[in-house]
């Protein structure tokens, strides 16, 4: 008599979702029925979003089509709206509307994180995040469009506004994005004769006393000096109070009209977790053991529930307790592989293994030939760090197809001129037709 397959439902198609499904597909000898639920049809390799903004990599080349990558997984486009761990069900809102309920034997919570914001007046109207491929492309288009607007402006104040760009949050992701976009703006201005002699104004607001703390104290201080040498106005121990009417009001009393404001002030666990009965930690993460099992306050396993990545609070056993693994791609990828294997071990009625990982370090790129890296305690700067950044992420990028595309894009970037082509019309593709049809 055939054995009924174990139903595995994976929530989220990021690092965790993709690599858990990949790992489970390798256990083809087991009776598994794997379903992955994700609102988008692709996984985004987020560490290369700054290179997308800078124009060194095509947006689609940092994405992986989930259906193509996962030949034996049922990929469902939809948004998770709830999890009932007692009934072992997941509620989903599919892209075609309605509501679907999936029952499971094992559920993987890999919903990731979203941009963390604060109640700041004007932020929703005038700000943009930097967590998705769409946001990265939008910031690039906005820089190029604002340079074109500045070239056409006759009012000096209006011109200065278009050439003023504000970043809120100085973690290394924000610093990487700012560095790439700053270089892009200078190239775009150089291509505009009407802007001869003009310089863009880039402002970085950071509440802490340092930037890019992830690379370590010494490289953080070096990064601060390096960015200031490039003309970037960095204000430490400063916050933004409001940004109504595209005027940023800072805690130091300064008021700055701006053409673009990018918010990179951290992330928080996916708020969908609040609609579940899963045990959450003090900051909204799923309470998770070192075996990547979702656990209650008493340490007992929520039967069949697993979690990893940015939405999970996982103890770092390499450090004195309490300590938690930071939310980054390095951990998410490795946790996902172990999680997939642990589910397979559970199906075989074997004990799951603990997640123990010593950090490889951090690599950051600050534009072409610039960067900082701390690899196993060895500090690198400028070209060596930049090469380490590209080499690491080329190897870490999922699928051979995407690796080849990214490398080819880098080669073309060296051989050709800087790509200053705006694609802002893609953000409103029906505009010309609406006008032609008599609309607005």
Residue ranges and their predicted role:
Residues 1-82, 165, 172-215, 262, ...:
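Beta1-alpha1 glycine-rich phosphate/pyrophosphate-binding loop at the start
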Residues 13, 94, 111-112, 252, ...:
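Glycine-rich, N-terminal phosphate-binding loop of Rossmann-like dinucleotide-binding domains
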Residues 1-5, 74-166, 262:
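FAD-binding core/adjacent interface of flavoenzyme oxidoreductases
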Residues 33, 73-90, 182-296, 352:
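A Rossmann-like FAD-binding core segment of flavoenzymes
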Residues 16, 112-115, 178, 267-269:
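Short glycine-rich anion-binding loops that position phosphate/pyrophosphate groups of nucleotides
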Residues 125-154, 248, 255-260, 264-334:
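FAD-site-proximal beta/loop scaffold in flavoenzymes
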Residues 3, 331, 335-440:
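C-terminal, flexible cofactor-proximal segment of oxidoreductases
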Residues 158-215, 222, 233-235, 325-343, ...:
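Rossmann-like dinucleotide-binding core of oxidoreductases
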């Amino acid at each position: 008599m055939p054995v009924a397959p174990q139903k595995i439902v994976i929530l989220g198609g990021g690092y965790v979702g993709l690599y858990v499904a990949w790992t489970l597909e390798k256990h083809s000898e087991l009776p598994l029925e794997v379903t992955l639920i994700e609102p988008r049809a692709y996984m985004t390799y987020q560490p290369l979003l700054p290179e997308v903004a800078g124009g060194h990599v095509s947006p689609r080349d940092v994405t992986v089509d989930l259906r193509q990558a996962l030949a034996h997984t049922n990929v469902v486009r939809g948004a998770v709206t709830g999890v009932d761990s007692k009934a072992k069900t997941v509620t989903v809102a599919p892209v075609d509307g309605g509501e679907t309920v999936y029952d499971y034997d094992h559920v993987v919570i890999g919903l990731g994180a979203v941009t963390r914001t604060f109640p700041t007046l004007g932020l929703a109207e005038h700000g943009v995040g930097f967590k998705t491929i769409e946001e990265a492309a939008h910031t690039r288009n906005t820089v190029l469009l604002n340079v074109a607007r500045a070239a056409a402006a006759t009012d000096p104040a209006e011109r200065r506004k278009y050439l003023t760009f504000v970043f809120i949050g100085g973690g290394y992701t924000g610093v990487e994005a700012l560095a790439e976009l700053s270089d892009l703006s200078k190239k775009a201005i150089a291509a505009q004769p009407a802007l001869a002699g003009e310089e863009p104004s880039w402002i970085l607001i950071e509440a802490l006393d340092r930037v890019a703390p992830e690379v370590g104290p010494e490289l953080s201080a070096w990064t601060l000096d390096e960015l200031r040498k490039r003309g970037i106005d960095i204000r430490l121990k400063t916050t933004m109070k409001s940004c109504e009417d595209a005027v940023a009001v800072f805690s130091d009393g300064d008021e700055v009209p701006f053409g673009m404001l990018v918010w990179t002030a951290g992330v928080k666990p996916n708020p969908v977790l609040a609609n579940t009965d899963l045990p959450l930690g003090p900051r909204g993460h799923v309470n998770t053991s070192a075996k990547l099992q979702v656990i209650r306050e008493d340490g007992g396993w929520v039967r069949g529930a697993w979690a990893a990545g940015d939405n999970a609070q996982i103890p770092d056993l390499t450090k004195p307790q309490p300590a938690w693994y930071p939310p980054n791609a390095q951990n998410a990828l490795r946790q996902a592989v172990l999680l997939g294997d642990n589910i397979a071990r559970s199906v075989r009625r074997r004990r799951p293994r603990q997640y123990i990982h010593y950090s490889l370090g951090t690599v950051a790129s600050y534009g072409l030939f610039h960067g900082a890296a701390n690899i196993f305690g060895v500090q690198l700067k400028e070209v060596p760090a930049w090469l380490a950044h590209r080499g690491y992420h080329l190897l870490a990028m999922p699928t051979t197809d995407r690796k080849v595309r990214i490398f080819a894009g880098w080669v073309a970037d060296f051989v050709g001129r800087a790509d200053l082509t705006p694609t802002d019309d893609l953000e409103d593709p029906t505009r010309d037709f609406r006008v032609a049809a008599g609309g607005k």
